[in-house]
Amino acid sequence: MLMAQNQHTGLSEQLASTGNDLWALLPEITIVGTLILLILFDLIFKKNKSIGLSVIAFVGLAYAFVLLIQQWYTFPNSAALMGGLLDINRLSILLKGGFVIGMSVALISALRSGPKQNDFFESSEVLVMLFGLLLGASFMTMSSNLLIIYISIEVVSICSYVLTGITKGKKKAEAGLKYLIFGAVASAIMLYGMSWLYGFTGSLDLTDAGFSAAISEIPRLPLFISCVLVMGGFIFKLGAFPLHIWSPDVYEAAPTPVVAVFSVIPKLAALSIIFKFVNIVSSPMIDWQVWIGVLAIASMTVGNFSALWQKDVKRMLAYSSIAHAGFLLVGILAFTSGGNQAMLFYASIYLLMNFAAFFLIQVFEKHTGTTSIDDMKGLGQKLPYLSVLILIVMIALTGLPPTAGFNAKLYIFSALWDSYQTGEKTILLWILVFGLLNTVVSLFYYLKIPYFLFFKTLSNEIQIKTTRTIDWLWGTLLVLPLLLLFFRSDWFVGLVNSINFELWIPK
């Protein structure tokens, strides 16, 4: 009788635990359900599918966002899921909320503007891949197990490969193949490094106390090799130096709304994994501040100087994203709560800036038929309001007032300076110097677009189409937060400061 009662109690506890896990994973379950509905709708209905597919997609995203708002108040602290394979907390919830908002912006942009962008909603393939990417990125932010991290990254990667080459064209197919080859190599390297860590620690679970204890016992060279191999895969998804070569071709070839997604969601998901990995796999034998500092300096410098010579705006923003990856890494190496909060604030503003930039580029692409900077000559005379909007976005990407881009870089540099004063490590001072110099360099290529818009002569060959009011309104809605958060960023800073980053690092 006693044994039966114990079994009944154990079963009840397991069911309760499973119920809690399913509640915590409801946003991801919603994404999966939306994905399945998109496929079924596409199979059942053969004509005029765009309205139905768009309704399913936006309702799914809206419901997932509502669930995330509820979870923000339900999970103020960190909670383990699925036996410790996943970890939910306010930081992962905030990141997932940003991903959902970003995906919604990309889909609205695809629906409202640009050449042949409504093809997104004529069949489910692109939408299914985008929702698959969103699902993988969501699990990346919650993963506490090396195997789950690998699977999540692969889901994001496979969807990205398909999205790059899904449209017709030799250039697009070439970019997709190049992305696939580089991604396969990076995944293999990362998996090999994970196998080393598993061999040394006997565990794949980052939350396992034995994992952290075993890390400190690994000799310097094997530990260094393991970490370099694993970080290689993470850096590839972040798009930082030296695994950034795929970015320009992919950005140029993929549809503009898809590029907007590529430029933000996989990067921020990878950043969350790097943050967790660096804080857990800590050892006196690995000076993360030096290694990540070198990567940050190289990413900022290579990205900015390469962008100077670009004639295509999407390739220019690809190199710009490499430079921004360097700035995102700076927040990690500060190793302070202020640095972590600055990193998250910068990441949030980066999301807003990039989606605004790519939407406006998409509008100009509709008028010129290309994304060449030369073809933007004089368009400021015909499209003055949209040109002013893109000027504001370029100022924000540079990191100048009166935009939130200035606040973001100010917080990053302030956190870096505080960390330098605390530890007096020379590498931190060098990063600060290079960061300031690279900000000056970025000014030259970011303002090249407004220069061509306002100070160059309009080509007679370009026929300007009537700009729809919805383009003006949507562009304004995307740019306005960049101005408002410059003057009133305190509420968002308070939101970021409410996150306990120590709870997010599994112990």
Predicted regions and their residues:
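Alpha-helical transmembrane segments of multi-pass membrane proteins predominantly involved
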Residues: 2-507
